[in-house]
């Protein structure tokens, strides 16, 4: 008998947690990545870092810059450059929308998550973001501390 499939599972490889603290997220989008074979193998073993990376437009295409996917140890001479530029697959309409948005001052494209979708394809969640000022970061930290304190008080007295 066939088993019923459960809810789709997204295997998260890398999460850019600092981006949510350092940037005000305005819009999200899921894009595909153009990868080499050894890069996919390396990602399947959960090795990647997107904390210092960003997306930029060059020659009418969207590229992921400064992402780190380490070399796959069994790939010998067919290995890849760990910090190479990786092309992002995005529709023309979305590309135009994001290009117009990033041409405004202070807007940038930051990666939030790198994961495998239900079909086993490597996907990247990018966000249109605006950098936070120092006082905005302090405000975020105060809100987070208050939420924790409120939960602690409710647990103790409520």
Curated annotation (Swiss-Prot):
One of its GO terms (molecular function) is RNA binding. It comes from the Bacteria. GO terms for biological process: trans-translation. Gene3D superfamilies: 2.40.280.10. The keyword RNA-binding applies. The keyword RNA-binding applies. It is found in: Cytoplasm. GO terms for cellular component: cytosol. InterPro entries: SmpB, SsrA-bd_prot. Keywords: Cytoplasm, RNA-binding. Pfam families: SmpB (PF01668). Required for rescue of stalled ribosomes mediated by trans-translation. Binds to transfer-messenger RNA (tmRNA), required for stable association of tmRNA with ribosomes. tmRNA and SmpB together mimic tRNA shape, replacing the anticodon stem-loop with SmpB. tmRNA is encoded by the ssrA gene; the 2 termini fold to resemble tRNA(Ala) and it encodes a 'tag peptide', a short internal open reading frame. During trans-translation Ala-aminoacylated tmRNA acts like a tRNA, entering the A-site of stalled ribosomes, displacing the stalled mRNA. NCBIfam families: PRK05422.1 (NF003843), smpB (TIGR00086). Belongs to the SmpB family. This is SsrA-binding protein. It comes from Bartonella quintana (strain Toulouse) (Rochalimaea quintana).
């Amino acid at each position: 008998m066939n088993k019923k499939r459960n809810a789709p599972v997204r295997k998260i490889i890398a999460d850019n947690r600092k981006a949510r603290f350092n940037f005000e997220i305005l819009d999200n989008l899921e894009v595909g990545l153009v990868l080499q074979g050894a890069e996919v193998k390396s990602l399947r073993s959960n090795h990647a870092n997107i904390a210092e990376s960003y997306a930029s437009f060059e020659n009418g295409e969207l590229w992921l810059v400064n992402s780190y996917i380490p070399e796959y140890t069994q790939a010998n001479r067919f290995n890849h450059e760990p910090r190479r530029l990786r092309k992002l697959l995005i529709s023309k309409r979305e590309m135009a929308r994001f290009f117009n948005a990033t041409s405004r001052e202070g807007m940038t494209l930051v990666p939030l998550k790198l994961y495998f979708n239900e079909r086993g394809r490597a996907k990247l969640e990018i966000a249109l973001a605006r950098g936070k000022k120092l006082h905005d970061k302090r405000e975020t930290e105060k809100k987070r501390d208050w939420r924790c304190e409120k939960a602690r008080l409710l647990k103790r007295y409520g």
